[in-house]
């Protein structure tokens, strides 16, 4: 599985593809000590977080010297929404990291399982995005320009070149198109639960749990840095059901979920 992320700024170039249609109209900011994946790492198809336990539920030392899990039933790198935990950031789930792209649903499933989590369901993702207030956007019911990374310039992509993935040429083209912002840098693009960048930035794979025009087991949700097809702004219900689990594109990423420990 070749994971693609970038460690530096890229040219502001991207495009929206026809499949990106919208079918349905308490935080800790400590920086992770490890470096984010670099462009060189991406070229080699390496994921320098795959062997890390940073996404495991850490055991904290209590006042009696015993070990306990963090409050809320979720790891410190996740936030709680109802009876489940969801990654605070898009994979690789690091504040200030560059979100993975060119990910298929199969890739996403494998990565989440390797980190002792699972791919979020559609219902979970929407619940974490809209919150108990059932917001249209993670931050409220009215779109605010610049609040999330959803207004980058549209530019045509060479799909035939990307189809050669994981060739060096395909990776270089994906880099040219990459306009995701570092995870968490849009501080106001935060849901009620505390999840960042849920609309815009990279489009995220989830397990389909609702009826759609196509019956693929996975869908993409939240649109990406150039918004949604037709100029629509990404909402907590913006979905793309047009692709099977092997599909990958220059803006496709994901985040992971897991069951929460104990009652909220």
Language-model features: locations:
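Short, P/G- and charge-enriched loop/turn segments at secondary-structure junctions
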Residues: 73-75, 239-245
């Amino acid at each position: 599985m070749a994971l693609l992320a970038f460690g530096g700024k890229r040219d502001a170039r991207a495009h929206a593809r026809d499949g990106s249609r919208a079918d349905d109209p308490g935080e800790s900011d400590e920086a992770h000590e490890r470096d984010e994946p670099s462009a060189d790492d991406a070229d080699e198809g390496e994921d320098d977080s795959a062997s890390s336990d940073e996404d495991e539920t850490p055991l904290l030392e209590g006042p009696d010297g015993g070990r306990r899990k963090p409050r809320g039933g979720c790891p410190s790198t996740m936030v709680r929404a109802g009876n489940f935990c969801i990654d605070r950031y898009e994979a690789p789930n690091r504040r200030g990291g560059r979100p993975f792209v060119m990910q298929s649903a199969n890739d996403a499933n494998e990565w989440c399982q390797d980190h002792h989590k699972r791919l979020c369901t559609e219902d979970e993702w929407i619940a974490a995005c809209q919150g108990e207030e059932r917001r249209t956007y993670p931050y409220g019911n009215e779109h605010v320009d610049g609040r999330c990374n959803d207004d980058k310039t549209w530019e045509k992509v060479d799909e035939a070149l990307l189809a050669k993935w994981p060739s060096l040429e395909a990776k270089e083209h994906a880099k040219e198109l990459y306009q995701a912002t570092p995870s968490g840098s849009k501080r106001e693009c935060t849901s009620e639960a505390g999840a960042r960048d849920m609309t815009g930035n990279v489009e995220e794979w989830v397990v389909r749990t609702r009826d759609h025009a196509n019956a693929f087991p996975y869908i993409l949700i939240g649109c990406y840095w150039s918004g949604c097809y037709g100029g629509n702004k990404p909402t907590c219900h913006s979905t793309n059901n047009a692709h099977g689990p092997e599909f990958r594109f220059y803006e496709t990423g994901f985040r992971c979920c897991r069951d929460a420990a104990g009652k909220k």
